[in-house]
Amino acid sequence: MSSTEAPTIIKTIEKSKSDKFECVIKILQNGLKALLISDPETEISSASLGVNIGSFSDSPDELGLAHFCEHLLFMGTEKYPSEDEYEEYLAKNGGNNNAFTKGDKTVYYFDIKNSAFEGALDRFAQFFICPKFNEGSVNREINAINSEFSKNKNIDIWRLDQLSKSELNPESPFSQFSTGNKETLSHNDIRERLLKMYNKLYTSEIMTLCIYSNMGLDTQINLVEKLFKDVPKRENFQMPKYDKVKPYDENSLNNFYKIIPVKNEEKIIFRWFFPFCENYNAKPLNFFTALFGHEGPNTITAYLKRENLITYLGTSTEDHANVFSTFDIYITLTKKGFDNYREVIKALLKYISVIKSKKINERYFNEEKNMRQIKFDFRNKKKPIDFTKKNCENLMLYKPEEVFTGKELFKEYNEKLLKNYLDMFDLNNLNICLLSKSFENECKLTEKFYGTKYSKEKLDLKKEEIDKFKYDEEKYIFDYPPENKFAPKNLEIYPNHNPEKIIKYPELIFNKENCKAYFLQDSEFNLPKGMIKLRIYFVKNLNHNSEIKNEIISHLLKKIIKLELNEILYMAEESNVEFKFKIYYDKMDISITGFNDSLKSGLKEFLTNIKNIELNIEKHKEVFLLQKEEYIKKLRNFFLQSSYKVSIDYMRKLLSTGANNHKDLLEFLLNEKLELNDLINFKNKMFLETNSVWLIQGNLLKETALEIINTTSEILELNIDTPITKSFYSKRAVNLKKNINYTYRFLNPNKDEQDSSIISVYQLGNLKNEEKQYYRILYSFLNPKFYDTLRTKETLGYIALMSQFDCLEIYHLVGIVQSSVKDPEYISGRIRNFYKEKEADIKNISEEDFNLHVKSLIIEAKRKDINLKEQFNRNWDEITLKRFKFNIKEENAEFLEKCTKEGFIKFYEEIIKKNMKRLDVEYVCQKHWEENEQKLKEEIIDCDSIKKRLVFDKISDFQDCNKLYPCFSNINYRKINQ
């Protein structure tokens, strides 16, 4: 479109039946496309802007430049020069923001309360009109990118992604390192290079904007024209061509790789390369993603799992800048599977060969097509920020009228196209990767950026071998999955029996000695869906002297039962009926969600199967031993995930009783005797003496809910009437002593990990309702400043954030930092310094700023639940905590409206400053250990409130030196065992 052409409006857009909003697409004179969505009911507005340029545009000597642009773009504009302006405006008005860079696109997005949306959108638009790329921020953001790279360096998914890129044609942009690091971005003229790239490639005609707001469409159109008309359209712009050289060649294909992963896992990854398919309405590769990833009867997953060769099989497909596509199959192997990995490879390729020999199954295609249509028509409402982010990308990929449907629906059955793509599943365009720690002596090659060790050879596999592969044809069938009996047939919305009296909150509809059930018929979301959750507390099973053993037993039992039911569970899930169960040492959670047409019959079938499963030595010994091995691997791998995630888990275990840590569980599995008979005995006793509670909610009638409760009680033989005399244990929160800095520190076993993490916890205690609101205001005030200080200004690590942690009604403020540049004790001091510096800001907060934070929290408290799931989960929390404050959001809003600046300052003085209760959880990498240990011997002199330091390396020692809080919730299913 030339700059003299009139703007265009597109009004005919395919929507879901459940979409209540209005929308249009506006194309501005400068070529920018804007999808505008008007939803009068939303309390939160959002905008996302995508630029059809990403890391593929980086030149080989400035890798990471597009990602660097994404970071630095937010650092001030000509109109709003302060680098903090955008972040501070969002923070004061309850907003959030982020961005991401892909190979061929970069997406920026935010959300905020409605009343502040125009101001935020103005600030946002300026990034694409007149950014400053603040010179003082350059080195800081290079450090931030390097921290991000360091954070990802020991995560297998990042390492594998880069290895697969590096094996492509080195002349192709698809082979490049995209994140960037200090080495690739450390040019003296990096800012000038960035400006050159921005001024050349950030042009309006390759930008897409998506807005979701309560504003009417005419208002949105005028606003977008006003704010985005000056986004420059670059003269002589030419879209980069990524297919000048072929991305893969003979050297890139038909290879077999052995790779040493970070985690102790054995995996096989199959990757096929395909030409890009422009016909997105036929979606051939998406069709085969569904088929080859299916876990129901007749499938390859069913065969491999029943033979105890794998624990997981997943499929995915990805289009790469409309140049080529890849199709991946990921398999996690058992020990047996790894020992026989060639048989696993041949079995999978044999399954594909059998499917190739058959006619494309139109029945299965139509089943997938119809199910996708039903899911789309009755989709749950998403948060505005998630919706704009997704559809901003979709606007780049699909016709404007198909922006919502292009990615989701199968519209066209094209047998010839499907057959053509099926025939391309061949050895010649396939790479196979085998991952194992056992390849230490075989992998002599090293990937440049992440240091991944691997070996490479041509795939030693012939079609004849696959053809000769034999499987027990009396026991197994290789074919398309059978027809799905769980597919919903009745999508009727049940009317409320008393429309004049709409019930807003769950009501107690079943009240027996040992069973309580709450029910709420939906009158808000109007979708043919329901959610059911049942928690069963065990009494007979609880043995205080063997909690660790019982936790292990319950985990293994859950895994074996799930494996037994895997095919039927997957068939249900394919029809959007999701059955989940978790077995703990003291309780069992059962849930079923999805289209209500199948909930009652589905739950009955699942529970009957669980009850009737007979574990026996002959049938289950092999799977028991394999699951035990898998659990040992899982526990060991826990310590190899992102450092801050390990620290967070330990924080939770330190601050409450009754949680077994991974180290103790691992030691028990390695050193103590555990047999299948232990699981059999546990299962036989599980339902002998129980206490249960239900929540049933959604498009269901009360009579149906009562039928479900009674049927379930009969199937599981729950004793709903007999009084329980035996008391059992309840979790309690740990009460930290005042003016002590507790430190729990432990060493990361991975010698290659360069990052340490610290979780710095300030315990506030049990708070009154009014105090809880001041706690939320304090978090709202400090959260963006914490990020700005420790992440942006001090560049201590890519992960630097605050969080709120409610542990059994005891409230905490939590600071989280993961860093490769400084040890945890140094960062602990910087966090103490942060609180010290912000004390003056808290005491001197202006009335205007205070009111902005309060108003944003009131809007959030009054915000309607976005979907049934959000509402259900909140109600479930109230039931399990036995608070029953189903109107908690309204209550919070009432208390917030009474909050004053003076009350806020008083809260800080009395609850925080005079009541300093602090715990640091430090997960220390090996390069930081000695320095960190030395600092732990020094006194804390930078905090007046801290008088003493106590250091621990055992959870039991830490908990033994502190008292416990009383049980604050009203729940008394379990009395404290004295």
Regions found by a protein language model. Give the residues of each.
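His/Glu-rich zincin catalytic helix
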Residues: 2-85, 122-125, 182-185, 195-307, ...
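M16 family metallopeptidases and their MPP-like homologs
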Residues: 37, 42-68, 82-127, 158-184, ...
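Enzymes that process phosphate groups on RNA ends and nucleotide/triphosphate substrates
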Residues: 145, 422, 760
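Short, conserved secondary-structure transition motifs
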Residues: 146-152, 241-262, 363-389, 393, ...
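Active-site glycine-rich loop that binds ribose-phosphate moieties when present
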Residues: 188-194, 674-678
